[in-house]
């Protein structure tokens, strides 16, 4: 009985952590991070990245 209670609490904690991560991931969809697919119909790259026309991925700007 004691082991079942511990497993239930750990499972519930894991479920809450995963639900939080999914929610955070959905709210970050405003701009694309490093190696994010960019281009027509896709979210724009975040301010510190540029969309590579050759690869169609967000990357660091070339100096």
From Swiss-Prot:
Residues 1-21 form the signal peptide. Pfam families: Toxin_12. Keywords: Disulfide bond, Ion channel impairing toxin, Knottin, Potassium channel impairing toxin, Secreted, Signal, Toxin, Voltage-gated potassium channel impairing toxin. InterPro entries: Huwentoxin-1. Disulfide bonds join 31-46, 38-51, 45-58. Residues 22-29 form a propeptide. The keyword Signal applies. Gating modifier of Kv2.1/KCNB1, Kv2.2/KCNB2 and Kv4.3/KCND3 channels. Belongs to the neurotoxin 10 (Hwtx-1) family. 44 (Jztx-4) subfamily. This is Kappa-theraphotoxin-Cg3a 1. It comes from Chilobrachys guangxiensis.
């Amino acid at each position: 009985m004691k082991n079942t209670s511990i497993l239930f609490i750990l499972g519930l904690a894991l479920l809450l952590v995963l639900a939080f991560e999914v929610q955070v991931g959905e709210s970050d969809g405003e701009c694309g991070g490093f190696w994010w697919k960019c281009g027509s119909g896709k979210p724009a790259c975040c301010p510190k990245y540029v969309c590579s026309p050759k690869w169609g991925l967000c990357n660091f700007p070339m100096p």
